[in-house]
């Protein structure tokens, strides 16, 4: 299916590995010129080879103040303008109510909420002026069904989801859509650190498999497509049936 985005430009945060890399590969395969960021130069170089084509790589630590804004500004300068923004960042360490302290909540907010808001504020105004834009935030199934052992992550990303919903309504008339892709258990380096055995990780998923980052990337690319112009303010669960709730 032609997604209608060939020739567009995109910035994908934390695009050097995992779900961000899956999104970058999918967008590039559809003819989008991409810029990615990450903290490790070697991983960025390897990701650029995996993505193929003319990839802009930028070093950035999204836990640092203003890093989200700076990434978007640098990506825009390199690409000329920005049509598509995929926000993404590594998740906080596991923790429950009992062992998650206030500093952990602050760190999670800075990484998984504030940096995303910075990126949106730096990119959406120009999208509105041009009359076309796509924002897709990679969040978590935890915003629909909170994960007890990922307390800080679930709290921070739930706050981001409210921001996305409100922003989507505000900018919809200007041709800009704002959505989120909400992954369940995908086999990434982060998941492997929490649950080292792949079969054990899959056992909590009704589909009894773990998600593939490349499949996830294809879903993100669709949300960023021309065909998805009537989809905004929503969260797409990509979770193998993990979330059991009825309501969005």
Regions found by a protein language model. Give the residues of each.
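Conserved glycine-rich cofactor-binding loop
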Residues: 14-18
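Short C-terminal tail/terminal secondary-structure segment
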Residues: 145, 221, 232-248
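A conserved structural motif in NAD(P)-dependent oxidoreductases
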Residues: 205-216, 227
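Short, small/polar-rich loop/turn modules that mediate ligand/substrate recognition or access, typified
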Residues: 86, 172, 177, 231-233
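Alpha-helical segment proximal to the catalytic Tyr-Lys
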Residues: 125, 169-170, 229
């Amino acid at each position: 299916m032609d997604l209608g985005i060939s020739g567009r430009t995109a910035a994908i945060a934390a695009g050097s590995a995992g779900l961000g890399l899956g999104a970058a590969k999918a967008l590039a395969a559809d003819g989008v010129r991409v810029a990615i960021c990450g903290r490790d130069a070697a991983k960025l170089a390897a990701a650029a080879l995996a993505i193929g084509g003319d990839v802009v790589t930028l070093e950035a630590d999204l836990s640092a103040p203003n890093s989200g804004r700076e990434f978007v500004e640098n990506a825009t300068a390199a690409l000329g303008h920005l049509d598509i923004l995929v926000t993404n960042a590594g998740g906080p360490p596991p923790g429950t109510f009992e062992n998650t302290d206030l500093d952990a909540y602050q760190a999670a907010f800075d990484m998984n909420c504030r940096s995303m808001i910075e990126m949106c504020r730096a990119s959406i105004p120009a999208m509105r002026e041009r009359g076309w834009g796509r924002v897709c935030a990679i969040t978590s199934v935890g915003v629909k069904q909170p994960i007890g052992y990922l307390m800080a992550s679930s709290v921070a990303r739930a706050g981001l989801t409210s921001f996305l919903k409100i922003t989507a309504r505000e900018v919809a008339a200007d041709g800009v859509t704002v959505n989120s892709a909400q992954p369940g258990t995908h086999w990434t380096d982060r998941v492997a650190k929490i649950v080292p055995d792949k079969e054990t990780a899959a056992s909590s998923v009704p589909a009894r498999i773990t998600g593939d980052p490349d499949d996830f990337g294809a879903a993100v690319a669709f949300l960023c497509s021309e065909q998805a112009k009537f989809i905004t303010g929503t969260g797409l669960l990509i979770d193998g049936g993990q979330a059991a709730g009825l309501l969005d």
